[in-house]
Amino acid sequence: SYTQTHSQNTHPGISGEIAEEHGHYVIGCDISRDMLNIAKDRGLQGDLCHSDMGQGLPFRVGTFDGVISISAVQWLCYSNKKHEIPRHRLTAFFRTLYFCLKRGGRAAIQLYPETAEQLELITGVAMKCGFTGGVVVDFPNSKKAKKIYLCLIAGEPDEKYEMPVAMGTNTNQVGFESRRDGFSKKRKKRMKHGKNRGDVK
């Protein structure tokens, strides 16, 4: 089973159709009822959930094999109301994302961070919530085709798992592997000092 989160400009039906074609049962999540209605009109066979991911994902532990998020997570870096603190909203999302994924489950998060600091904040919170993984940048030298992905694994990857290779360059994989190593080393250091996965301050 797969779940998805989407921005206000896309809807769960787009990637949901592709996942369904590959035999997956899909649950689409969106903060906009209009986008959910569009997905329903397109004939998405799975379930739809009206939810603000900044308040956490409303699913049981170990529900999903994988998660796809398209152009949504970066919006958690902004505050629309006084009580909305970006780090807290990111923590609510990644903590619940971690626990609703099966151990070893994967999350592919496509995002558009406005600054390097935003990307660092997002990846840092994901790591503190127990994820390993890294950032892949497709076509980094193209303004139109450039895409940034946060590729996450709930827990440590198995030995046979190969991280995605970026499109449009042969050198980007080096930076990605370096970031992934950083994830693993920092995570092991935290565990050595007695911090459990999912503990975020």
Can you describe what each PLM-predicted range is?
Residues 73-75, 112-117:
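Short "lid" loop at the C-terminus of a central beta-strand within the Rossmann-like core
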Residues 114-130, 148:
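Short alpha-helix
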Residues 1-3:
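Conserved class I S-adenosyl-L-methionine
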Residues 67-72:
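Hydrophobic beta-strand segment of the Class I
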Residues 103-112:
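Conserved beta-strand signature within the Rossmann-like core of class I S-adenosyl-L-methionine
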Residues 129, 139-201:
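C-terminal lobe and adjacent flexible extensions of AdoMet/dcAdoMet transferase-like proteins
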